[in-house]
């Protein structure tokens, strides 16, 4: 504006009108002289820019303060450096946060070898296993693990526990082999964490069973044990209220004994699972 007025002779009033500023503001600007602090800030801003470029933009206002105060032998505070760097639009290179990786356990997954062919020609040829949740008392939880034989639908072994953990599943398998030490079944399960664990894989090597697993979200791939859960809950669990873990345990034990020995089905020629098992 000053150049246009001096060189072209344009009226200051017209130029101020075009610029949208008051004439008084223009004259005030002409008379403005920077204060000592403003001059100091300008000098400091120059030092900040030089140091920022020299360090390839890695300095934030804290490090900038430490380095320049030492160089200039000053005690400027952090806010001053912060304001100057913000005015100059200087930002430190942000260090990328290192991902907090938690190494996931190796999953030992098997194919769906069973492929829904559950019918077995002999006992201990095909087993299916799973864990179901049972509630008792005031919302407390227990977990029932069981193995069912595809030959006669008998419950080969079962374990009730307060915790749904590896130990529950391992004890169920060990109990089944204690009763059937020479069994070499195809043992089918879902892909729950217990069945994909290293401990389960080691148990497989120990007992030499063939591992089979359901496909993801395909509960019908494990139909025999799923059907048993439905039968057990409809005929026993849902009919009673269990105030304690011990009362639930007694009920489970009573029902499975009944199921194996006295629940007769047409599929087994009118026999119970254990009767059919002994008859052949």
What are these regions (language model features)?
Residues 1-11, 43, 276:
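Residue-centric detector for conserved, function-critical "anchor" positions
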Residues 16, 25-122, 272-280:
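Basic, flexible linker segments flanking DNA-binding modules
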Residues 94-99, 187-191, 207-224, 241-243:
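RNase H-like polynucleotidyl transferase catalytic core
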Residues 120-156, 162-163:
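An active-site-proximal beta-strand-loop segment
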Residues 182-196, 271-272:
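Acidic/histidine-rich, metal-coordinating catalytic segments
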């Amino acid at each position: 504006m000053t150049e246009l007025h001096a060189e072209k002779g344009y009226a200051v009033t017209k130029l101020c009108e075009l610029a949208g500023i008051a004439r008084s503001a223009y004259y005030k600007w002409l008379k403005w002289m920077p204060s000592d602090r403003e001059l100091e800030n300008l000098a400091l801003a120059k030092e900040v820019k030089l140091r920022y470029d020299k360090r390839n933009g890695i300095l934030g206002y804290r490090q900038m303060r430490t380095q320049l105060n030492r160089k200039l032998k000053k005690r400027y505070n952090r806010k001053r450096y912060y304001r100057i760097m913000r005015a100059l639009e200087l930002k430190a290179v942000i260090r990328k946060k290192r991902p907090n990786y938690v190494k996931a356990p190796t999953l030992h997954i098997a194919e769906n070898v069973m492929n829904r062919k559950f019918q077995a020609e002999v006992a201990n040829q095909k087993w299916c296993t799973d864990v179901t949740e049972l509630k008792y008392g005031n919302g407390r939880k227990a977990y029932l693990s069981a193995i069912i034989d595809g030959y006669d639908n008998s419950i080969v072994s079962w374990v009730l526990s307060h915790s749904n953990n590896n130990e529950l599943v391992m004890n169920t398998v060990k109990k089944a082999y204690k009763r059937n030490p020479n069994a070499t079944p195809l043992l089918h399960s879902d892909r729950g964490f217990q069945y994909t664990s290293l401990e389960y894989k080691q148990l497989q090597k120990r007992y030499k069973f063939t591992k089979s697993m359901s496909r993801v979200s395909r509960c019908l791939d494990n139909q025999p044990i799923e059907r048993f859960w439905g039968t057990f809950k409809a005929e026993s669990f849902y009919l009673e209220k269990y105030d304690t873990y011990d009362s639930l345990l007694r009920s489970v034990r009573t029902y499975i004994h009944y199921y194996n020995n006295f629940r007769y089905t047409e599929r087994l020629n009118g026999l119970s699972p254990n009767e059919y098992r002994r008859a052949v």
